[in-house]
Amino acid sequence: SVDDLREHGHCLTDVRIRESTIPGAGQGLFANRDFLPGEVVTISPVLALPKNVVENSVHDSVLKNYCFAEADSDLALFPINYGPLINHSPEPNVAIEWFDWSPAVNAMSAKYNGGQSLGHDLKQADKLGMGAQELYSASFAPLDIAYKATHSIKKGDEIFVSYGSAWQQAWDRYTARSRSTEQQKSGRPMFRQYMALPAGSYPRNWI
C-alpha cells in the first residue's frame, strides 16, 4: 500500500541528475525535494570487488575513482545506483553509513507473506560478518549504504559527500602537477584514487 511505501520505502525520484555546479565535474546529483537533517537522501547497493581486479582493469578505466577502499584491506566496494554521481566537497551535506533493509523486509513479510521472507533479509550484522570471498561470490549486491542529510537540504541543492582526506590530498597533488611545465609537455595522466568510507566502517574481518 501507499502507507507501507511511505513507512518502509525510499523514492528514487527524491533526487535527480543534472550537470554539476562544480566546473568540469560532469554530472551531479540534486535534491528533488527538501530534506531534514538525518533523512535518507538516497541508498546505494554495494558490490564487493577484489582490489587487484579494480587496479588491474584496462588502462583507461577510472573504476578505482568510484570505489571505496581501506589501505589495510584487499576489499574494494563499488556503490551502484546514484552513489557514483555524488560529487566530493570539503563541506558535504550528506554522510555515509551502512543501511539495513532487514526491518522493512521483515515487516512486509509478516504483513503480506505469512512471515515468509520476501527477499534477502540478512541482518546488517550478518552481512558485515561475511568474509571477502563470501561477498565476492554473492549472487546479489549484499551491502547497502545510505547517504543521510547532515543538515537541511533544499530542493534543487546539489548533493555532496566527503571522499576523505586521502582523496583530497591526492587531488591537490594531481592538480598541482597538471599545472607544471613538465606535466604540460608529458600530457595529463588520468586521476585514480579510492574514496574512503567514514572511519570505522570496515569491520575487522575485512582487514
Regions found by a protein language model. Name each.
Residues 1-207:
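Conserved catalytic SET/PR domain of SAM-dependent protein methyltransferases, capturing the structural core
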